Amino acid sequence: MLAGGTEGTICPVGIGGFDSMHALSRRNDDPAHASRPFDVDRDGFVMGEGAGLLVLEEYEHAKARGAKIYCELSGYGLSGDAYHITTPATDGPVRSMQMALKHAGLKPEDIDYLNAHGTSTSVGDVNESKAVRELFGEHTDKLVVSSTKGATGHLLGGAGGIESVFTVLAIRDQVAPPTINVVNQDPECCINVCKGEPQKMEIRAAMKNNFGFGGTNATLVFQRV
């Protein structure tokens, strides 16, 4: 089974729609630093384009044919809070993460790394940070979090696919990818953000979040095999 996503919406309609919602960064004079998840000076996301696909296969079948196994997709969670078309709430993301943990048979403290949705919007980054702290409690300070959208921008329908690939590679390489462009972390984003440089660490289990406009939330849990 192939699972992933792709999207290419850098066009007048795509950009115009998100601009009319005031979702995009206006840092046009400094585009390389415009996408800055969790930074106090973030002002919206930068649209990107791309794709990411994973090959999903039953474990024994993959072993029998000698496939290279990167990790196990052990849990998923979905929720729809329908709170507001653009303004998020914490209950939907919390439920999505809880469901993924339950499906994987893990506790919050079992997660070593979180690849966040982290779009660089003023409200969204704070909301996700609060949801993470609500679920993970004291473990939040140990949980390493990064948003790779600082480097890629927001791929919209392609974001979950490519960021799942990043999460799988983090487990393979035992390295948390950095969140770039975080100069001054917003104190309201009270999570342990991996900033600037990759962080070599043990990653036994990792979580991937994607939270869409309208309150559509999805979470995956991957584990080292």
PLM features: residue spans?
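Conserved beta-strand-centric core segments of catalytic alpha/beta enzyme folds
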Residues: 1-61, 159-225
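Beta-strand segments within the central parallel beta-sheet cores of soluble alpha/beta enzyme folds
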Residues: 1-6, 68-76, 109-116, 143-149, ...
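Conserved beta-ketoacyl condensing-enzyme motif
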Residues: 6-17, 108-124
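Conserved small-residue
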Residues: 18, 55, 73, 111, ...
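Acidic-glycine-rich active-site phosphate/pyrophosphate-binding loop
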Residues: 19-33, 69, 126-145, 192-196
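Condensing-enzyme catalytic core mediating Claisen C-C bond formation in acyl metabolism
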Residues: 29-104, 113
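Short glycine/threonine-rich loop-to-helix capping motif typified by GTGT followed
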Residues: 82-93, 119-136, 155-162, 195
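Stable alpha-helical structural segments in soluble proteins, enriched in small hydrophobic residues
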Residues: 96-104, 131, 135, 167, ...
